[in-house]
């Protein structure tokens, strides 16, 4: 007797459910995506016990015809594709015909639906088996209730996390779908309490404010790019707004939320040297492309996709984000504790530059007196959580209030930071400077690190024949495997100024180096660059030069607790203003922080 047998439908559906229905959030995702495909404009999701007890999804979409209701719970039954060619031009979120039978097989499911052209249809299924059916109201749309989830698969139920964790996954799903479809009104309630709401007016900025809070939304800037193959729209947060994980990076492709590691890397490369190590940005990208360029039929959950022009897309994303920051002032603002009302009038304020005398010739600064009249008004402060959505209705927000404020991201015609006039130094580490806009605090090490980094980056990209012989040639010995690896990348190292000659068994000798190598650090730099090659295994010239420039700039920059003369401070600030990115060091730490005059006056209660 043969050993191979065909599985019955109930068991096959449970196996399929293991891939499609991982947790309550998976059920919500599949049902809401079906509602979106049905052209719904209002979608409401109700949960009890994070969906483990009950999930209800109500929409005003097209609804089901009566005969379609029964067929919808058969495996691989779908209205969204008809033949093999349709797989290459998928424009809907669902297409596999697995969601409803998979969900029904591991739960109790009740369906009420109508096309609005007569009485609707009512079905009840338990474990995928039809137990009741009849008529219901003619309200157009669909109402699906899923209860007793995983009642017949206790092993899956055993691995569910806490209510709080499972609820967080559901909120995450709704957040991303709301961003992908801002023209749809979403409402999410849990145990009778509203957690999230959007009005469906099509304004992505209001959805961002509902998810991340008004403060974060104000610090996100719009981006746009278009080529023959791709159109990119979205919002990216300023580099000062970061998170510890990539969970806050949302990428939508043709209306579908996806996860793609190479796209994440491209986004972060767009923030090159603007992010601190180990931190990630908050971003929302909406990418449109021809369906022929994307394969979504990779996994039943449809989160993983493949692109046929992945390199071109990554380069466009990287370039678009990088260009969005090139004309922006990225100086973090320090804000005082918020107050609900401010005085209608304010005294005029003047400032003067205080220049310390030094033993050396210091540039003289003309004292400037400028009167500023501040016109303030009553402000209504909407407190929004950065991580979770409160109960406030975001539709109450003025659309313009979500646009990044000009003082945070103002565009500069000539210079990315204004002229700064030094006041002095604090603890031999921070430079204090001022201008008519307030007080600036500059990290002197980070500032010079940025200056040196851009200098060394340019030098490393230029081939030079101006070499300086080493007084005592440097001999380097490695293991056999390391020697072979270094030998294979000698040309790349030479392009960066490290000239290696084989010298005996598993050894190299270095006789000279470029003249621009920092004096006294030549040997350390050569050894460090070879170490980077050994760590990288596969050497990329751009990455090698980048790491070398960062390493050199860090070693050569002034350190903390190093006191500077006035002329040195002036020179440092002027050099910083001439850099291409004067806001962060190569490691992504901020260089300069701004206290506006208004914020200082709030701190000292001069403005109440």
From Swiss-Prot:
Gene Ontology biological process: mismatch repair
Biological classification of the source: Bacteria, Bacillati, Bacillota, Bacilli, Bacillales
CDD domains: HATPase_MutL-MLH-PMS-like (cd16926), MutL_Trans (cd00782)
GO molecular function, one term: ATP hydrolysis activity
Annotated Gene Ontology cellular component terms: mismatch repair complex
Protein name: DNA mismatch repair protein MutL
Keywords: DNA damage, DNA repair
Species, as recorded: Anoxybacillus flavithermus (strain DSM 21510 / WK1)
Superkingdom of origin organism: Bacteria
Keyword Cell cycle: no
Functional note: This protein is involved in the repair of mismatches in DNA. It is required for dam-dependent methyl-directed DNA mismatch repair. May act as a 'molecular matchmaker', a protein that promotes the formation of a stable complex between two or more DNA-binding proteins in an ATP-dependent manner without itself being part of a final effector complex.
HAMAP family: DNA_mis_repair
Annotated signal peptide: none
């Amino acid at each position: 007797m043969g050993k191979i047998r065909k599985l019955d439908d109930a068991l096959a559906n449970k196996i399929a459910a293991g891939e499609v229905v991982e947790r309550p959030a998976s059920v919500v995702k599949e049902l809401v995506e079906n509602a979106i495909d049905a052209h719904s404009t209002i979608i409401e999701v109700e949960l009890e016990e994070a969906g483990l007890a009950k999930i209800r999804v109500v929409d005003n979409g097209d609804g089901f015809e009566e005969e379609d209701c029964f067929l919808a719970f058969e495996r691989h039954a779908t209205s969204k594709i008809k033949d093999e060619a349709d797989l290459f031009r998928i424009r809907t979120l669902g297409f596999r015909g697995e969601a409803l039978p998979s969900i029904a097989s591991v739960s109790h499911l009740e369906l009420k639906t109508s096309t609005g052209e007569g009485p609707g249809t009512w079905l009840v299924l338990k474990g995928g088996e039809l137990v009741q059916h009849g008529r219901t109201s003619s309200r157009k749309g669909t109402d699906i209730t899923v209860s007793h989830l995983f009642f017949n698969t206790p092993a899956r139920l055993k691995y569910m996390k806490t209510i709080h964790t499972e609820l967080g996954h559901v909120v995450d799903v709704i957040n991303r779908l709301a961003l992908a479809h801002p023209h749809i009104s979403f409402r999410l309630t849990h145990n009778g309490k509203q957690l999230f709401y959007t009005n469906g007016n099509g304004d992505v900025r209001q959805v961002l404010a509902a998810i991340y809070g008004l403060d974060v939304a104000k610090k996100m800037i719009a981006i746009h790019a278009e080529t023959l193959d791709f159109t990119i729209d979205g919002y990216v947060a300023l580099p000062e707004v970061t998170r510890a994980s990539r969970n806050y990076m949302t990428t939508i492709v043709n209306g579908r939320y996806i996860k793609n590691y190479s796209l994440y890397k491209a986004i972060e490369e767009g923030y090159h040297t603007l992010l601190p190590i180990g931190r990630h940005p908050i971003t929302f990208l909406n990418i449109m492309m021809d369906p022929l360029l994307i394969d979504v039929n990779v996994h039943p959950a449809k989160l993983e996709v493949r692109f046929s022009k992945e390199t071109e897309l990554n380069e466009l994303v990287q370039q678009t984000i990088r260009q969005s920051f090139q004309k922006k002032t990225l100086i973090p603002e320090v804000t005082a504790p918020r107050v609900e009302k401010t005085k209608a009038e304010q005294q005029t304020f003047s400032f003067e530059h205080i220049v310390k005398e030094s033993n050396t010739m210091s540039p003289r600064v003309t004292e400037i007196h400028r009167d500023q009249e501040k016109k303030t008004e009553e402000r209504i402060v909407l407190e929004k959580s950065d991580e979770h959505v409160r109960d406030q209705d975001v539709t109450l927000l003025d659309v313009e209030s979500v646009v990044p404020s000009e003082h945070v991201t103002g565009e500069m015609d000539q210079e990315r930071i204004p002229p700064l006039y030094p006041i002095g130094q604090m603890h031999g580490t921070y430079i204090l400077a001022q201008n008519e806009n307030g007080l600036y605090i500059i990290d002197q090490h980070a500032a010079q690190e940025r200056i040196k980094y851009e200098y060394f980056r340019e030098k490393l990209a230029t081939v030079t024949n101006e070499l300086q012989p080493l007084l005592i040639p440097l001999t380097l010995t490695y293991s056999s495997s390391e020697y072979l690896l270094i030998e294979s990348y000698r040309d790349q190292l030479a392009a960066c100024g490290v000239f290696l000659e084989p010298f005996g068994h598993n050894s190299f000798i270095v006789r000279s180096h470029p003249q621009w190598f920092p004096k006294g650090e030549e040997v350390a730099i050569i050894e460090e660059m070879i170490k980077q090659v050994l760590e990288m295994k596969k050497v990329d010239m751009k990455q090698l030069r980048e790491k070398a420039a960062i390493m050199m700039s860090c070693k050569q920059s002034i350190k903390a607790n190093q006191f500077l003369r006035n002329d040195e401070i002036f020179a440092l600030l002027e050099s910083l203003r001439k850099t291409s990115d004067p806001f962060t060091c190569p490691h992504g730490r901020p260089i300069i922080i701004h206290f506006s005059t208004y914020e200082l006056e709030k701190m000292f209660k001069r403005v109440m």
